[in-house]
Regions:
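Acetyl-CoA-dependent GNAT
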Residues: 8, 16-93, 98, 103-104, ...
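Conserved acetyl-CoA-binding loop-helix of GNAT-fold acetyltransferases
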Residues: 99-102, 108-121, 146-147
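Conserved GNAT acetyl-CoA-binding A-motif
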Residues: 123-136
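Structural motif
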Residues: 126, 147-148
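C-terminal "cap" of GNAT-fold acetyltransferases
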Residues: 134-138, 148, 155-174
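Helix-turn-helix
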Residues: 141
Length: 174
């Protein structure tokens, strides 16, 4: 497998990533603490309307200097990390990890960790000391980021929090 930056005309290949997964628990923030709660559901691919909504936003992100890092198995995109270019945080030392997705058949093989590490290296080269992450509140996702060193952000970005209040807002050192 190879890891490399995506070209603008490859952005829509992101939608070929298989997001399917069975979930048994989600996290919620209560009084500044993570609380694990039972919540069984099956995610089958991309949510309705997500592709139509996010595609233009991804092009805007790319055009303003966002970094799109892909993991490829031969010519097949099996994972992606998208790093935005807009500084966040009171000190302006955070960059948002907009996306981190790995196809179902490639999980638990270090793909996500490699993509996160590459996004962190790019963020560091741009002067950031933290990745800002709005993590899907599923148990597997939150645990992945915690294993990579991320912690709950107790002062989330107001705009990003308003967009995704159910997500677990985290920061991860780069």
């Amino acid at each position: 497998m190879i890891i490399r930056q995506l070209a603008r005309d490859e952005i829509e290949t992101i939608w070929t990533i298989d997001r399917s997964e069975v979930h048994h628990h989600i996290y919620q923030m209560r009084n500044g603490q993570l609380v694990l709660t039972p919540a069984y559901f099956e995610a089958h691919g991309w949510a309705p309307g997500r592709i139509e909504h996010d595609t233009p936003l991804l092009y805007v992100c790319f055009d303003r200097g966002g970094a799109f890092v892909g993991m490829f198995d031969d010519h097949k995109l099996v994972g992606v990390a998208v790093l935005d270019s807009i500084p966040l945080g009171a000190a302006g030392d955070q960059l948002q990890l907009k996306y981190l997705y790995v196809s179902r058949d490639y999980r638990q093989q270090g793909v996500g960790k490699r993509l996160l590490r590459e996004a962190g290296a790019i963020a560091h080269s741009r002067g950031a000391t933290w990745l800002y992450i709005s993590a899907t509140p599923t148990e597997n996702t939150v645990h992945f980021y915690q294993r990579c060193g991320a912690v709950v952000n107790l002062t989330p970005d107001p705009e990003l929090y308003a967009q995704e209040p159910e997500d677990i807002h985290m920061v991860c050192p780069v």
